[in-house]
Amino acid sequence: NPRGLPAFKHGNXVLNESYAXMYLESQFGSXGXLIPDADVIYYNWKVPEGERHD
């Protein structure tokens, strides 16, 4: 890691942290999902603040 970027290490594979979630999900997919696929994760970006429900 010459540039000092955050890294994730699993066995002999060293990954950038931005790819770690996708890597873990592909390796351990039977244990569940790490990346949500529902539209609720975009709620704060898609719904104007005045129209949001608490």
Swiss-Prot record:
Modification note: The N-terminus is blocked.
Record keyword Protein biosynthesis present: no
Gene Ontology CC annotation, any one: cytoplasm
Reaction(s) this enzyme catalyzes, per UniProt: RX + glutathione = an S-substituted glutathione + a halide anion + H(+)
The EC number(s) this enzyme carries: 2.5.1.18
Molecular function terms from GO: glutathione transferase activity
UniProt keyword terms in alphabetical order: Cytoplasm, Transferase
Assembly, per entry: Homodimer.
Record's function text: Conjugation of reduced glutathione to a wide number of exogenous and endogenous hydrophobic electrophiles.
Family affiliation: Belongs to the GST superfamily. Theta family.
Protein name (record): Glutathione S-transferase 6.7
